Curated annotation (Swiss-Prot):
Annotated function: Tetrapolymerization of the monopyrrole PBG into the hydroxymethylbilane pre-uroporphyrinogen in several discrete steps.
Catalytic activity: 4 porphobilinogen + H2O = hydroxymethylbilane + 4 NH4(+)
More info: The porphobilinogen subunits are added to the dipyrromethane group.
Pathway field: Porphyrin-containing compound metabolism; protoporphyrin-IX biosynthesis; coproporphyrinogen-III from 5-aminolevulinate: step 2/4; Porphyrin-containing compound metabolism; chlorophyll biosynthesis
Gene3D superfamilies registered for this protein in UniProt: Periplasmic binding protein-like II (3.40.190.10), Porphobilinogen deaminase, C-terminal domain (3.30.160.40)
Keywords attached to this entry: Chlorophyll biosynthesis, Porphyrin biosynthesis, Transferase
GO BP terms: chlorophyll biosynthetic process; protoporphyrinogen IX biosynthetic process
Family label: Belongs to the HMBS family.
Modification sites for S-(dipyrrolylmethanemethyl)cysteine: C245
Record-annotated disulphide pairs: none
Gene name per UniProt: hemC
Protein name: Porphobilinogen deaminase
Listed GO CC annotations: cytoplasm
Length: 316
């Protein structure tokens, strides 16, 4: 069966729309003649802006509404920032494609008062905004003299808050800044020795309905093998730790020849406990590498740290 139309579900945010239109354009180039439509909608994570993400819970926070459209037959695929896509998907859905990754690093963005400072030079009392527990824990570990403040809203809103003086600096995903045309706001890319990035950060994931080979054949034209191998190892690591995108779990992955090297981290919210290790294996079996690394961190006390975090969030 040859498809002549494809329906894409996506979030309404500006970044999501930019990413989805890119996917649409690439698919149209690869499959001339196909009619592709986009249905944009708000997700729970888009609507709740006055509560920290970690307190809401993150299972499908930015994906459930899109997945529902596919499950009832109103959409064929959904385009996600892969870091927002849970590692366990609803029955009947699958991760069909992972696109080539942008730089997955975190980025320091500063207001003009700090334009001559690098991260390690920020003075005591500097107010740093982030909504990510992963970034918070790692930066507290390395820079306990800074003041950390939650920040919500879309990327443009966050930059406006920064420029208005509500924060001295922000930590944001470099890929998101680049995709929205704010690459010039990247003051410094944070080294992975300081802040391991989120699982899947910088890549797009295209989710689709299982048992629809005609859809899978269309979207596989955007698959990037190396990115897919790296992200599958990262997602396996996260899945084995039973974590989500709102817990202090960070990763870094790279491919060297036939080997895939995965580094993973789990940290306490105050940054005082931080466990980090690496695993090397054959890139043809990326999920095994992620699972083995997770088990190694478990043996070093990772689950005890995560349980303390889950208990703390529930109390709040």
């Amino acid at each position: 069966m040859v498809l002549d139309q494809l329906r894409i579900a996506t979030r309404r945010s500006k970044l999501a729309m930019v990413q989805t239109h890119w996917v649409k354009e690439q698919l149209e180039k690869a499959h001339p003649g196909i009619n592709i439509s986009i249905e944009a909608m708000a997700t729970q994570g888009d609507k709740i802006l006055d509560v920290a993400l970690a307190k809401i819970g993150d299972k499908g926070l930015f994906t459930k509404e899109l997945e529902a459209q596919m499950l009832i037959g109103r959409a064929d695929i959904a385009v996600h920032s892969l870091k927002d896509l849970p590692t366990n998907l609803p029955e009947g859905l699958m991760l069909g494609c992972v696109t080539e990754r942008e730089d997955p690093a975190d980025a320091l963005v500063v207001n003009k008062s700090l334009k001559d400072k690098q991260l390690h030079e920020l003075p005591p009392g500097t107010i740093l905004g982030t909504s990510s527990l992963r970034r918070l824990a790692q930066l507290r570990h390395h820079y306990p003299h800074l003041i950390f403040k939650d920040v919500r809203g879309n990327l443009i809103t966050r930059l406006e808050k920064l420029d208005a003086g509500a924060y001295d600096c922000l930590i944001l995903a470099a890929a998101g800044l680049t995709r929205l045309g704010f690459g010039d706001r990247v003051h410094q890319l944070i080294p992975c020795e300081i802040s391991l990035h989120a699982v899947g950060q910088g890549a797009l994931g295209i989710e689709c309905v299982e048992n629809k080979p005609e859809v899978l054949e269309i979207i596989k034209s955007l698959e990037h093998e190396e990115t897919s191998q790296r992200c599958l190892s990262e997602r396996s690591f996260l899945r084995e730790l039973e974590g989500g995108c709102q817990v202090p779990i960070g990763v870094n992955s790279q491919i060297s020849g036939q080997d895939l090297i995965l580094t993973g981290m789990v940290a306490s919210l105050d940054g005082k406990k931080l466990i980090k290790d690496s695993k090397r294996g054959d890139k043809s079996n990326p999920e095994l590498i992620g699972k083995e690394l997770a088990n190694e961190l478990k043996s070093q006390g990772a689950m005890e740290i995560l349980q303390e975090i889950f208990d703390s969030v529930r109390k709040d």
